[in-house]
Amino acid sequence: MTTIHTLGYPRIGAQRELKFALESFWKGASSEDDLRATGSALRARHWAAQRDAGLDFVTVGDFAWYDQVQQTAALLGAVPTRYGFDPAQLTLAQSFVLARGNADHAAMEMTKWFDTNYHYLVPELTPDLLDRQWGPGTEWLFDEVREAQALGHRVKVVLLGPITFLHLAKARHGLADKLALLPQVLQAYTAVLQRLAALKVEWVQIDEPALVLDLPQAWVDAFGPAHQALAAAKGPKRLLATYFEAASHHAALIQSLPVDGVHLDLVRAPDQVAAFAPWSADKVLSVGVVDGRNIWRTDLTRVLAHLTPLAQALGDRLWIAPSCSLLHVPVDLSAETKLDDELKGWLAFARQKLDELAVIKRALVEGPAAVQGELDDNRIAIASRTQSRRVHNAGVKKRVAAIRAADAVRAAPYPARADAQQARLNLPLLPTTTIGSFPQTPEIRRARAQHKRGDLPALDYLQRMRTEIADVVRRQEALGLDMLVHGEAERNDMVEYFGELLWGYAFTANGWVQSYGSRCVKPPVIYGDVYRPEAMTVEWSKYAQSLTSKPMKGMLTGPVTMLQWSFVRDDQPREQTALQIALALRDEVCDLEAAGIAAIQIDEPAFREGLPLRASDVPTYLEWAARAFRVSASGVRNDTQIHTHMCYSEFNDILPAIASMDADVITIETSRSNMELLDAFAEFAYPNEIGPGVYDIHSPRVPRVDEMESLLDKAAQVVPVQRLWVNPDCGLKTRGWPEVEAALQGIVEATHRLRAKHANAKRAGSKAAHVEGEMA
C-alpha cells in the first residue's frame, strides 16, 4: 500500500504559541517548565494532525526551540568551543546563548536556509574538534521519540544528513578543510542511529539537500563513504531526502548509495524522476508532489495523472509527500478569518496539505471513485482560480507584453545624468543621507493600529502622520544632513505597505511562518495580475518636501523584493509577476518626479536572495531581476536621481548585475565588515555613486566620530571621493531617537572632517570630477 508522510511540519503553532512562550521565557516572565510544556503540547498537537489526516508516520525531529541545524549540532555534540559549554550537558538556557548571544559571547552566525526565507544558525568548525571525540550530545531527539511513541504514534525520525551538515557549517580559526571532520561527524551519527534502532524506530529520513547543488568533486566523493558508514551502523531504514531543486545531476551517485529509499522534489523539478529510471527493486521512491513552499491548493487531477504510472510500476515502494518540509507555509487555513471565500478556496496551508496527501493516497489505492467528492471540489477550486477575473487582467498583461528595450534604459548614461543631477541638487562633496525609516515610537504604532481598526478617523490620522513627518524633517535639518527622507511613519512593513495599495495582493490574518527563533513573518499573497490603482506615496513625500529647501528622497520597495518576500502565484513565470510590479512602481516613480521629488530610492534588499541554487540558472535570474529594476526606474528625466539600497555580506558574484541596474546611487551595509565589502566594488570598477554604511544600526552602540572617520578614510581609498555618499547601514526604524541623533551627529562631524581632507575634490557631476574619478 502506498505510504504518505511529511518531511516536516511547522513548529510555531497556529497562533504562534511557540513565539510567545519563547519571548516570555527570555524576559523572565515564565519558567523553563512552562516553556517545555508549550513545546510538548505543540508536538502532541502536530503529531495528532498528521495521524488524523491519515499519514502512515508522524515525523519526529522537526521541532526545534530555535533552529533545527543548531539542534542537530547539539545532538552530535558539536557545540562551538568558544562558549565553553559541555556538549553532553548543554542546557536549554545555554542553547539560547548560542542562538542569541549574551554580554560575554556573540551569537552564532545566521544565514538563509538554501533559497528560502528561513534562517539557520551556522555550525562552527574549529581545528580543536579534530582532536576530540564527538558526542554524546543532548538527548532531545530520543526524548521526543519516546514522547511520540508514548502517544501511540508510528515514528519516522528526520535528521539533517552528515554531508549537508558539514557543507552548511563554517570553518574557523584556520581549519583548512571541513571534510577533515567527516570521521568525527560519522562517529556521532552512527551512535545516534544505533540509539534510534534501540528505540524501535523503523525509518530515519536523512536530509541531504546539498545534493541539489553544484558541488566540488571532493564533496561529491564524500557521499559514498559517508553513507556506507551510516549503513554499517545497523540502524533503522534510511530515506535519503533531497529537495528545493532537481538532484538528477547526481542520479548515478544517489542510486549507488546504500540507502533504503530516496525522496525527490517533483514540484520544483517534475521531470527529474526520469533520470532515476529504472528504479531499484529494493528501494522506496518518495515523491514530493504537494508544494511545501507555497500556499496554493494542489491540482490533484494533474498529480494523479503523473503518479498513476509510478504507482503501477512501484506498488508499495511508492511514497508520497510534500516537496519539502511544511515549515515554510502557515499552519492552518481554518484559523484564517481575513480572506474572502473565493480566495480562501484557492489556498492550502500545512494542515490542508496533509489532507491533500490523504486524498491522493486513497485515489491511488482505492480508485478515484473513493474520493470523487474531494476531487470534484478540488477541480472546481482550480478552475475558479484559473478563470477568475480577479487573477487575470488583460490590460496588465498587454502592458507587460508591450515593454520595449528602451523602457528599461535611462535616457542618458550615468556621467551625463550626474551632470544634470548635480546641477539640480547642488550637493556638497560626500553628501550625507539616511536609508529611509526613522524610529517608530509607540505613539506612531498606536495611531496606525487605531486607524486600521477604524478608531481613528482618516483626517486625524493624516494630521498625526504629518506631525511625525514634520518632526523628522526638523530633526534632519538640525543635524545638517544633505538629502532628507520623510521617515516612513505611515508604514508598518516595507512590503505590506505597498501590497495593501496594489491590486493583485491579499493579506492573511494568521498566515505566519517562522523566519528564525521567535521571529515570524506574514508574507503577502500575490494572487493575480498586479497594478497600481492610484498613487501610494506621493502625498507623503510631497508634504515632506514642502517643509524644506533640501532635496527629499521618495522611498519605494523594489520589484524583486516585493516578489521575494511574498507567497507568489504559481500560474505564470516569476519574471512576469516581477515586471507587473515594476510597471506599477514605474508609475509611482514618475508621479513622484512630477510632484517635484528630485531623488527616489527603490530598495532591493532581497535582490540576492532570489539567486537560484544551480549556477546554470543564475544568469537568467540576474538578467530579468535587473531588468525589472530598470523598468521601475527608467521613466524619469536625467536630472532625477535614482537610489537603491542593498544589505549583503557578499557582492562579488552579482556585481555585474548590480551595475546593470544602473542606479545613480547605491547604498550598502559595510560597517560590520570594516569597509572590506567595498574592495569588490573597487576591483570591479563600479561606475556609479556608492554610499557605504558607517553606522551599524543593528547594534545599540553609537560609534565614535573617529571610528566613522576611519571607515570613511578606508572607503575613500577604494572609491573615488567624488562618488562617495555617507549614510548608516540600514533604516533606523528599530532604534531609539537618542542613539539615532547621536549617531547621525557623529556621521555629519566625520563627514566634515573628511571634506576638509579633500578640499580640492569636486562632486560627481562636473567634468573635473569625471577626470579625477578616472584617475583615482
UniProtKB/Swiss-Prot annotation:
Pathway listed for it is: Amino-acid biosynthesis; L-methionine biosynthesis via de novo pathway; L-methionine from L-homocysteine (MetE route): step 1/1
The residues that cross the membrane are none
The note on the cofactor says:
Binds 1 zinc ion per subunit.
The record ties this protein, via SUPFAM superfamilies, to: UROD/MetE-like (SSF51726)
Catalytic residues at H698
Give the function comment from the record.
Catalyzes the transfer of a methyl group from 5-methyltetrahydrofolate to homocysteine resulting in methionine formation.
Protein name, UniProt field? 5-methyltetrahydropteroyltriglutamate--homocysteine methyltransferase
Provenance organism: Ralstonia pickettii (strain 12J)
